[in-house]
Amino acid sequence: MEKTSLKLVFLFSLTVIALCLSLSAAREMAKEEVNCIGGHCPDGKKDCNCLPLIAPTMDIYETNESCRTDNECIKYCPKGCKIVDCNFGTCLCEYC
């Protein structure tokens, strides 16, 4: 009986220690998540790892212009598009 109760106390102690360690690790992760607000360090914070905000790029631009060949779409797509296609009668401009 005494060996069983010692094993239970030991097991309970290990469980409590593991729980405390996991809670402290979760608290540290929560602190790191709020370092950057809007891509900048909040006031009072010195060591932030804020990455610059990147503007989204438009990969595909679909016009409402009808077409029969790819060459017809060149005049409707913005300059600098790498791929200009006539796709099922609609001009598609890609990688602009």
From Swiss-Prot:
GO biological process: defense response to fungus; killing of cells of another organism
Intrachain S-S bonds: C48-C96, C67-C86, C73-C91, C77-C93
Signal sequence interval, chain numbering: 1-26
Domain of life (superkingdom): Eukaryota
UniProt keyword list: Antimicrobial, Disulfide bond, Fungicide, Plant defense, Secreted, Signal
GO cellular component, one term: extracellular region
Localization terms from the record: Secreted
The family this protein is said to belong to: Belongs to the DEFL family.
Annotated protein name in UniProt: Putative defensin-like protein 263
Species for this entry: Arabidopsis thaliana
